[in-house]
């Protein structure tokens, strides 16, 4: 999400509605994409998010998938300072498919995404995470939200995730994968453009 908190999820509901409208008009051959959102605790605490998720649930926007970065921390500290909402129950009550995963377990996230892609309604995947994961002193704290980490914290993170590469360097094996995915995307785009013509 970008801009004022809560706006991103509301915008995404609009994008998902537009996709469904275009799909109804042009069919699956031309329009069949999903809308993905990454939203944090603060995003879901805003009032506009309730209106947006209610509408999405009511319209059964099965093409909408929200990944909720559930780290229970805002810039002011713990979310418990200002909010006691059970987001899973809130979304379920609004007609959504809901799942909870360990947000640091990529296999679990991938599995939840695959399930959400075939759901008959919008999906919330609550990814339980630790803000500042791997930082020796800042992990799980308010200062991890937006403060400077410093050399010691950065070194601790790099060690905890076994990242030996220099700063601002993309390792060759990752670059190869990115390029492979880019080429695959280009092939899909070219095939879509042929169908569009």
What are these regions (language model features)?
Residues 1-183:
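Glycine-rich ThDP/TPP pyrophosphate-binding loop and its adjacent helix/strand module
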Residues 180-197:
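Hard-cation-handling environments
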């Amino acid at each position: 999400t970008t801009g004022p908190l809560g706006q991103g999820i509301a915008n995404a509901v609009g994008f998902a509605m537009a996709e469904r409208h275009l799909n109804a008009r042009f069919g699956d051959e031309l329009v069949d994409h999903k809308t993905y959102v990454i939203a944090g605790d603060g995003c879901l605490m805003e009032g506009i998010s309730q209106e947006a998720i209610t509408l999405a649930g009511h319209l059964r926007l099965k093409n909408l998938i929200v990944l909720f970065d559930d780290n229970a921390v805002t810039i002011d500290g713990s979310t418990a300072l200002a909010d006691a909402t059970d987001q899973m129950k809130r979304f379920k009550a609004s007609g959504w498919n809901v799942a909870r995963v360990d947000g640091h377990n990529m296999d679990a996230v991938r599995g939840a995404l695959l399930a959400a892609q075939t759901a008959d309604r919008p999906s919330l995947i609550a990814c339980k995470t630790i803000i500042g994961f791997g930082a020796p002193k800042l992990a799980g704290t308010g200062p991890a939200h937006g403060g400077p980490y410093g050399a010691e914290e950065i070194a601790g993170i790099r060690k905890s995730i076994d990242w030996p590469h220099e700063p601002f360097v993309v390792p060759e094996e990752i670059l190869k994968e990115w390029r492979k995915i880019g080429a695959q995307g280009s092939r899909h785009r070219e095939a879509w453009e042929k169908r569009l013509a």
